[in-house]
């Protein structure tokens, strides 16, 4: 997260750092005591041959995020967090996750920066119009939290991160809630929405 600060230790209890054999890979979000969302592995299994639900070791320090009961409202102040780089043009990974407040933007504001982006992509745009606060490389899979609910999953955005007029793009969790609940319940045959 660029333009943010170190997260308070109690506010990132659902945020995880995912490592592979070569080191840090990306952020992820805990959505129940056993299921971890990693952006490419959980929300888009149709695009991958290997649908992974990663095992989580329970502890009193882990608190999953609530799935949304309704979509977020444009203008909402939302919280982003992640283990990604904290500098926009070079990779500077922090020792603790960083957080920032950004605003949920109208689709029209998003279309200015991203002509190919539309409602059919089941996404949300959030950021600060003047730039300076944004998720960045390594934050993918982390949460966009609005009113205490897990509304978005960090997906993609501009390079360099935090560029004015180019907000971050997030997978809209509300559109996948029924499918996520089916997967959590053990229904591996559930079909991911297009």
From Swiss-Prot:
Signal peptide: none annotated. The keyword GTP-binding does not apply. Optimum pH is 7-9. The active site is at 140 (charge relay system). This is Kallikrein-like enzyme LV-Ka. The lineage of its organism: Eukaryota, Metazoa, Chordata, Craniata, Vertebrata. It is found in: Secreted. Shows kallikrein-like activity, releasing bradykinin from kininogen. Also activates plasminogen, which is also a plasma kallikrein activity. In vivo, lowers blood pressure after intravenous injection in rat. Expressed by the venom gland. Belongs to the peptidase S1 family. Snake venom subfamily. Completely inhibited by the serine protease inhibitors NPGB and PMSF, partially inhibited by benzamidines, and weakly or not inhibited by SBTI and EDTA.
